[in-house]
Amino acid sequence: MLAEVRGLNEECGVFGIWGHEDAAQITYYGLQSLQHRGQEGAGIVATDGKHLHGVKGEGLVTEVFTQKKVQELPGFGAIGHVRYTTAGGGGYENVQPLLFHSQSGSLALAHNGNLINATSLKHQLEGQGSIFQTTSDTEVLAHLIRRGGFGTMKDQVKHALSMLKGAYAFLIMTENELMVALDPNGLRPLSIGQLGEAFCVASETCAFDIVGAKFIRDVEPGELLIINKDGMRSERFSMATNQSICTMEYVYFSRPDSDIHGINVHSARKRSGIQLAKEMNIEADVVTGVPDSSISAAIGFAEATGIPYEMGLIKNRYVGRTFIQPSQSLREQGVKMKLSPVRGVVEGKRVVMVDDSIVRGTTSRRIVKMLKDAGALEVHVCITSPPIKNPCYYGIDTSTREELISASHSAEELRQAIGADSLTFLSVEGLIEAIGHEKQNSHCGQCLACFTGEYPTEILPDTMHPHDKELMC
């Protein structure tokens, strides 16, 4: 369903290109394809080999950039960013890419993820004389690079990356080089493509399709790619890797036409609907999915059960951005404005409502009420992921247990709270099976922490909400 009314949001998306005469224009198109990953800000920095030039602003890509602004960014290399605020707060100064100028040259950074040791590193750097211009955790990397004391930029970057903990997919650009880095756990998706002689990098492969690039491969955990006039080469900044891609990328965040580690997102969601149907028995008249991210799963559920699939809920695509706000009252109003039941489909019917997840419960409760007000006899809520009981510290805006309804309610209590006739969640094992990763480790290469509480990295105290610290004691 829509992030605007869900309150479950990815931090951002990144796109970069090197070796193309229209680098900024290609990046603009790439960012548009990643708009679902962040709607609060957008920016592009381009290089002509001598200088870095940037444009950024708050709002959607089309609100920040006119054609004239894009044309004011000449050069053969560019990086871009779309942002949803989860760490450091909003505001123009935190919109990325962040651009820094010094006597030794310029540096631009774009980041998807969340650094769980940013606070302690910032205190350490400030003690050494660093002055921070933003409240974004991304700026920490810039100061670490500049204070590295090593001879080459590559060595400075490697040393800086070795000090970071958490989730990060970084694009790092100077006047003459683009570097790409993914954290040792590979928590966020990042892929490499090729457009003619140019190299592209993006948070999702759907961006390559939009700009006409050919997918090459996914960036590996702990890998640093260096792209310049000599081509692209790969090095390691960490050998201690443990692939743990965020499972919610498949469940909700990524576009259905994207592939992550060779697995198509639409296909994974459809299989999750099929798997959920195998794990339960239900008698109903119609299956409907909550637009947009649950449509694939609903189709799979309908195919597996033989219950007809219908468009029982319609999304209003023309509501303004007033509701892209991180407040509960606007989320509730947003549900009403963004979704409408189709009375002719649900009236007098036993309805299976397929959705991808329940975070706070507000959305599910209001949709169930909508369907019943439209005449549904029964509403059976089927969730194609396990209950989300644990906060995410890796770049998703669920950083406290208090805001997760499944952390304090049983499935039956939650069913009563949302007013459903039944409520069923997909099992952890079923979700792993549906996604279909090779069993390369105990968690099949996925981060399942929001469901299981087993985090792939150490969770530092300064990352946690005070209430959650007490629970961990």
What are these regions (language model features)?
Residues 130, 150-151, 281-285, 303-310, ...:
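Secondary-structure transition/capping motifs at alpha-helix termini
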Residues 159, 207, 214-215, 219-223, ...:
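Phosphate/diphosphate-binding loops
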Residues 65, 134, 139, 309-320, ...:
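A conserved beta-strand->alpha-helix junction
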